[in-house]
Amino acid sequence: MKKLGLLMILISIIVVFSCSSGKKPLPDKIVFQTDYNAALKMATDEHKPMIIDFYTDWCGWCKVLDTVTYVDPLVIGMSADDIFVKVNAEVDTALARKYSIAGYPTVVVAGPDGREKDRIWGYLPPTDFYNQVQLYLQGKETLEDYLGRLKDEPENLDYLSLIAEKFASRSRFDDAIEYYRKIVALDPDNEQDHGADAMAAIYDTQARARDYEGAIATCKRIVEKFPGTSEADDAEAMIGYYTARSGDSRKALRLYRDYLEKHPASENAQWVKKRVADLEDNI
């Protein structure tokens, strides 16, 4: 009986080991697909969501995403259930246009058919990245979700801001500006700490749309409306930058020098000095 008991224990151990060894091992790294069409077929065949990372070689935060977020075990584990794709947006420009990529990194969370659920615009650390993807896959915190919430709370400044940012990330700049302006109208004097940020977001969005004159005009309004604030300081520094982007380097240089004379101790001073040096080298 004793021998029989030991034999049964041994058989049980063998059975358990056999069952566990038959499980698919967890991935130890993310294997990125680089052929979008092949990845789309794989996602369709396996009925798995797609995580599509649009990057460029010069994008600093793209590299942080690679070296911090994508090597974290929590995020690596996602690749067992999701198809990860990497797209160099400056090489596959057609795909970048298809998804209306507005900046880098942009990570599009899509269904097995490639249709977007929502996107992560910019860098997120591992846990935040994981949680945001899971929410999108559940239909939560998406553009459609927030538009639905806004119907019940049309003056919710947080919802308006999130919706505007989501439109901007999709290159829908006019829609983004419309929602940012709603925030400014509801908080014109920045009493709720939303109005000034919304105005700053407007000039950033105008610049992304290459409306540099509009961006400069918005910056000037911030300087006039909120003098002595960090928002005004940032906006004044950006006037020179957008002037340079519009093609008038000499005027931009004058604006930068005027800024440094007025704000020598500003947190933006070093950044402005770098812009001055760059312009002086090229004029």
Model segments located where?
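Non-catalytic, surface beta->alpha helical segment in thiol-disulfide oxidoreductase systems
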Residues: Y70, A102-E141
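Thiol-based oxidoreductase modules, predominantly thioredoxin-like and allied folds used
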Residues: I30-T34, F54-T56, V68-A94, Y104, ...
